């Protein structure tokens, strides 16, 4: 409202010429949107950031540690906290509160045909299946990056980043024709708890009588489950590249489910994790992030997301642009980088240097605590070149005027065959 805008605009204008430290958080207009677990997480050391009004746990302070940011262009005061969270996800099990996800229900007798027209992937799947897809514009650019879960013959749940919810709702509503379809923002009705890591199945079996085996609950499916003394819908997907489930829980049962997971988690080393860890894990796995690595100006094929595009399914927005790009060839590729020196950091917008020449910028960066160095993604021009041509070059990333040698890969450096998510 106007009171929110008055506070926030006064701060943003004042920051225009200030030092834009990495991870700098706004101080005004805070606490407007909170998860049902906000006070639970606060009591356990959460240090919050804000996106789209949502208070989200960015990292968790240790007992006796100050619960605030100390900004720097080098390693900030939460670096070791993130490392512990990151390695817990890679080697044990972590719990993320992702209630800030945007959740959109699309239903009606024309819901399937509507989504087939807007989404690049195949939407005609069995109820219970989860589809990773993009919504494209006429140029093949990415308007939205989302998962779609088919709940029934006529109902679908779209899960989008919290920061893009209003944009995605507008795009959907803009493209409704003379169709019987209802589009509803259902975000306030459910919280999302993400149980992620190789010990995720062990934890889930302690709190639920349901079967979480690969046979009963394979990757890319959603199941209704009992958990503690409550109910949830468990989606077997991941944004960190590990075995895990996103638990969609009615907001009135969220605290109970959290407490059940926390109590059972003591036996398996459960660790609460924040958004900074989510980000570092997803960049290790080379998962794209909308607004950084993929935007409406980035072609879906050049972003390396062709596996989620099905031109043979029939017409959809952007199909002609996809076919044209496929026939013409890619003019650039999204590449993953890891610095050879473990000390420097990558944040965003650092120059990519190929064979001594600046050719692009880093779209997103963080520290790969498992890979052992700073990691990032960025586009590299590759007109008429093969994958081998691109990877045969020498790459450096320019950081504060110094060029640091970097390893480059077109596949995820962490678990390139995606075996861990299907453990």
Residue ranges of predicted features:
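Glycine/proline-enriched, intrinsically flexible loops and inter-domain linkers
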Residues: 1-423
